[in-house]
Amino acid sequence: MVDQFRSFSRTVTERVGALSDRFMERNRPLAQSRMLWEIGLEGCEIRLLRSRLGLDSGHASRLLRSLEAEGLAVVEPSASDRRVRVARLTSRGRRERALLDERSDTHASTILEALDPARREQLVGAMRTVERLLTAAAVEIRMVDPAGRDAVLCLSAYYAELNRRSDKGFDPTAGISAEPHELRPPAGAFFVAYLRGEAIGCGGVKHHDGAPAEIKRMWVAESARGLGVGRRMLACLEGCARDNGAATAHIETNGTLVEAISLYLSAGYVEVPAFNDEPFADHWFEKQFADVEAHKLNTTRTLPRHKSPSRWA
């Protein structure tokens, strides 16, 4: 499996011209051209450029300086917050970006035209699948402060979607509480999913001694749906609940959120009678965890360095 992955990577880097110092016959390598493209016509914060391209600050700075030296880009403070640096294309940079787009389209067409129509469709379909799966693998889930910037952005988008999709209207202060202090350790935890540095989903869990854990505020941005983020987030929240001794998890949801209902059922939840008086909920779900103690042992045990896992058998 690893050998195939590496072979695929070598083929792609060779075919797209990533090894050349003159990408698309211009006087710069792919990395600089990609930075030029990523800045975009509207400009972009340096922080986001680094996250999207997976670059450390030193490498990103070198690429930007090379574009500045060519007169293709400028770096300046943001108009809204002078502490934030923004990269913008110059007029020359915009023309160069348009030329790179044109040559990239021609290069792609040349590769596709070498195949018959059936193989062309097969290749493009496989590319679509690879892109989706590699994007899914790039998603990171991190525990964050539920009152932090990214958490608040996700929760605001979540509340807006609930109000848009349901005729009940959602008021987070009217139902079962999930306040920041309830979603911080040791009372609970809150997680945000990130893709290329941008928050695309969230979820929280409330711990209760001797009672089921409550999974709250699960949401995934529309742009990230289909990547398996919801399932990963749910597994993360369940793992957190089990690590804190829960034998059962509870989730309630609104009837309009059919995707959430489908996810919960496929993840082993069963619908049960209402276990709380959440006014926005139409469905209540429960999941029993098996082998909670074994799970806690496995997650706290650390294998000695350089020793095979079989030594624990």
Which residues does each predicted region cover?
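Conserved acetyl-CoA-binding loop-helix of GNAT-fold acetyltransferases
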Residues: V220, G226-G239, S262-S266
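Terminal interaction helix/tail motif
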Residues: E102-P146, F285-K287, R301
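Conserved GNAT acetyl-CoA-binding A-motif
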Residues: R47-L48, P212, L234, C240-N254
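Acetyl-CoA-dependent GNAT
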Residues: A136, M143-K216, A221, L234, ...
